[in-house]
Amino acid sequence: THPSLPNYLAMIGGDTFGVKDDAPSCFASDLSLSQSCHHVEGESLVDQLEDAGLTFALYAETLPAAGDLTLASPPAPAALYAQKHNPFAYFDRIAKNPARLEKLKPLEALTADLSGEAPNLAFIVPNQCHDGHGSLTCKDPVRLARDFDDFLKQTIGAIRASRNWTRDSAIVVTFDEGESRDTPKSPGSHTEDDNRVATIAVTDCGGPAVNDAPLNHYSLLATIEDGFHLRRLRKASGAPTLMNLFDRPCR
């Protein structure tokens, strides 16, 4: 769907929860009294992971500090970090839980975590000049593409070179939304004109493979849940997955 936020909520919550804009979290530290806001009371992927004894962390580029619930950094209109790209900040059970808030970290923390004990699930978000989309301070499409490519090379390279990367590890690169302004259909009614994004899976197992089935962000959540042997949340319950990209023999 459009804009960004509902897609991020779908990735970890299995629903868009009626959200149709990029309004801030009701827990934002710099929320003004006049601003509308969103929050989600229900369960998320974080609850599922921790209930199963697994760990998570968000690594957000240009987030000022761990647990910071600021709307933007630097402040708008020059924002690089944008809260609309951090779905964890919207869930009550995360934003009101100090221990979980500490798992929402600046990207720089990834280096230390890769050298020690990395989380079972790492959710990495580039800033708005490195995500291929751009902002008021970075509009040139050629530079955006180059910077996005450099970000991926550096980040994926660091992960794969770390002690935590094993034959059971995987990286999924995806986007929140495409350029189309059309409202996407359900997977079963997909058309070529719908909102489409590229999604790439990286593992050390098998050769190149393609999944050309119509998928959405519920499919990504379902794939993560199936991979960790978790039950599926909400609209992820009936979603097709990307598992054919991972169910391949390792050398």
Which residues fall in each region the model found?
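N-terminal pro-sequences and low-complexity stem/linker regions of secreted or lumenal proteins
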Residues: 1-251
